[in-house]
Amino acid sequence: MISAFYAFLDYLKNIKTASPHTLRNYCIDLNSFKSFLEKQGELSPSSPICLLTKERKETELPFSLFTKDSVRLYVLELMQENKAKRTIKRRLSAIKSFSQYCIKNRIIFEDPTETIHGPRLPKELPSPITYEQVEILMATPDLSKYTGFRDRCLLELFYSSGLRISEIVAINHWDIDFNSNLIRIRGKGKKERLVPMTPHAAQWLQQYLHHPERAHVEQDPQAFFLNRFGKRLTTRSIDRKFQKYLRQSGLSGSITPHTIRHTIATHWLENGMDLKTIQALLGHSSLETTTIYTHVSMKLKKQTHEESHPHS
């Protein structure tokens, strides 16, 4: 079964082109399930599954342990350990994906996860921030430093185009057309879309592109956003930078790069953009996903009404 885990991860990496973040989560989730099965089968713990491992020493973990009962007991154990509902849902989803892979490749012939469902997640509305808070965040990076100038450009692009963090780090030089202010984005499922950026954001990006220190550090000839060593920025490094600027600006630590995506989508809607256009810009496969912003917009309107009404 260990070899099947590795084959599945290789499939995700090479065929589905999953991001490093996604692969890392799959490794965490499958290792958790593997440890549970080893405990159930009274087997000695084996080395964690890791794609970085060059020599894969595969200990025996029989598929006979992978049953409906074992999956059900695993979910029950996670609940008893008070794991977050979202964590349980994600781990079960990873096992279901692994099971489907095994069936497709005729490793197993029945799906042990078919009738097992994770906990229901409460529908959480995104919490956008105000335009004033966006401005405060934008003003935080130190523009006298190359990295600060780059980070201001990142923030401008987040708010200009509503991109995912993984989409921003994947941008190459030739993806940006400054004549039309369009960026070719590779989104989820390798789907490409053209996303406009504001002239204001385009101006910042052009200045960054010609920044003298950028030319000095450049080692990756493809990547647009570079770290101080000239390599492509990672999602993790942007996350760290983002949290640093939140601390410096005094804004809430619960704000994330994805919050900016929610924010601009809400602002687009409030300024009259239709849902189909917002769906296309954000790269949502379903209009239902985009519809959540109508609820957010109404929630904000009700809040403003209550705060402004003389009888409130």
Curated annotation (Swiss-Prot):
Main subcellular localisation = cytoplasm
A GO term, aspect molecular function = DNA binding
What Pfam families would the database entry show?
A: Phage_int_SAM_4, Phage_integrase
- Mention any one GO cellular component term assigned to this protein in its UniProt record: cytoplasm
Annotated localization: Cytoplasm
Where does the Core-binding (CB) domain start and stop, copy by copy? 1-103
* Residue ranges of coiled coil: none
Domain of life of the source:
Bacteria
Q: List the GO biological process terms.
A: cell division; chromosome segregation; DNA transposition
Q: Which UniProt keywords are present, listed alphabetically? A: Cell cycle, Cell division, Chromosome partition, Cytoplasm, DNA integration, DNA recombination, DNA-binding
Q: Where is the active site?
A: R164, K188, H258, R261, H284, Y293 (o-(3'-phospho-dna)-tyrosine intermediate)
Please state every residue range assigned to the domain named Tyr recombinase.
124-306
Functionally, this protein is described as follows: Site-specific tyrosine recombinase, which acts by catalyzing the cutting and rejoining of the recombining DNA molecules. The XerC-XerD complex is essential to convert dimers of the bacterial chromosome into monomers to permit their segregation at cell division. It also contributes to the segregational stability of plasmids.
Do you know which HAMAP family this protein is assigned to?
A: Recomb_XerC_XerD
Record-stated family: Belongs to the 'phage' integrase family. XerC subfamily.
Instruction: Provide the assembly information.
Output: Forms a cyclic heterotetrameric complex composed of two molecules of XerC and two molecules of XerD.
PANTHER family given in the database record: PHAGE INTEGRASE-RELATED, TYROSINE RECOMBINASE XERC
Question: What name appears for this protein in its UniProt entry?
Answer: Tyrosine recombinase XerC
Source organism lineage?
Bacteria, Pseudomonadati, Chlamydiota, Chlamydiia, Chlamydiales
Gene that encodes the chain: xerC
